[in-house]
Amino acid sequence: EGPRTFMGFSVSDYPNMFMVIGPGSVGVLANYPPHIEMQVAWIADFLEYLSANGNTRAEVDADAQDQWCAEVEAAAVGTMFNAPNCHSWYNGGNIEGKSRVIPIYMGGLDRFMARARDLAANDYEGFSIH
C-alpha cells in the first residue's frame, strides 16, 4: 500500500505519535529548516491545545489520512514523478512489485503551511481527541 500519513505529522492507529518530515509532507522539495520549524511549531501548538483542553490522546482519523493521501497524489498529477515511465524512489517505481505511491506533497510549502494553519484553526478537525 505504501507509506500513508496525515500531512507527514501523524499516522492513524498510532495515537500520540507525531513526526517531522514524514511521508506526505513537502519533504525534500522544501528548504528543510523552515519546513522543520513549521512542523515542530505545529506539533507543539497541538500538544498545548490538547493539554489546555484536558486531553491526553490524539489520533488522526483514517478518513482524514486517506483524504490527505489522495491530495498528495493529486498534487503530483502532471509531474515527472508521476509519469508511467518514471521508475524512481520518489514513486516506488525503482523496486519491482513495490506499490507506486508518491510520498511527497508537491503542492509547495506555502500551501502545506496554509493547510496546517487551517487545520489548527478548525480545532484539529480530522483527529479523534480524548
PLM region spans:
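Central helical "cap/lid" subdomain
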Residues: 1-8
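C-terminal, flexible cofactor-proximal segment of oxidoreductases
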Residues: 5, 18-130
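Short glycine-/polar-rich loops that comprise or flank the Walker A/P-loop
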Residues: 14-16
